[in-house]
Structures are given as C-alpha cells and as structure tokens.
Amino acid sequence: MTVLTKKDHGWYQGLYEVVNKEKYVGLKKPFYRSSWECRFMSWCDNNPNVIKWSFESIEIPYVITENGFSKSHRYIPDFYVEILNKQNQLKKFLVEIKPYNQGPIKNSKNEVYVPKPPKNKNAKALKIYYLEMKTLKKNTLKWNAARSYCQRNGL
C-alpha cells in the first residue's frame, strides 16, 4: 500500500508501490511528486481498462528561444497510458499532471488562461508575474512538442 508522505515544503511525494506489476512497463519505480500524481498512479494501477502504464518513460526534445538564443531541452511527460475504451479499441495517451495556472488551459469560452498582471507593481509582485509567464511559455512549448510527438506516433 502506498502512503502519502507530506514534506516540510507542503506537498506530498514518495515511491508508489505498484500492485498490478504486469501493467506497469516503466524502467524506473514510479515516484509521485504530488497527491494528484499518486492518485493517478493508483487509478492506472487499479483500473481494469488500463492495459499498460509507465511513469516518466518518454523524452520529447523541444527548443526555447530567448533573447535571440536557442537552447535545446527535453520534456518528459509524467505518464504514458494504454487504455481499452468502451468499443474495445486500444487508445494511447501521454498525461501531464499540472495545476491550472501552469498550463495553456482553455476555459468554457475556449479562452487560454494567462496570468493577470499584478495590480501592485512592487518588485515581489512583478517577479511572481514574470515567473508565471515564463512557466506558461515553457509549458506551452513543451506541450506543443508533445502534440507533435503524439501525431507522429499515433497517440
């Protein structure tokens, strides 16, 4: 049984103990960094429709360009999952577990979430805003690379 361990910094992390070992195809032991990841691992492990799953098993290259300089990076999605749907068809997915404010999430009006500039323009508020925008840009580039990867690989 996996036990959520709360760290001093306020989030849960630990090794997930796989119950259905024949379904887990990852090369390394699954390590959750949040309660959301732990719950998703448990869902994959115990859901009879999940045929295979792995944790951080795929690397996708992408490039970030800042100030005219390009730097190569690699994006490692949290999960790879193969599921049998209701029509008994095999569906393959890459899954990333992220909070709402860290990704290009669309609301019900199909608008992409963008952090609002701070009302108070002090140094701390501006720094937080800058970091949120930088994270959103980086995650958008990663996920665009992931979409291309999925299209090329039939996911």
Each model region followed by its residue ranges:
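Electrostatic, structured charged patches in enzyme active sites and in nucleic-acid/phosphate-binding
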Residues: 1-155
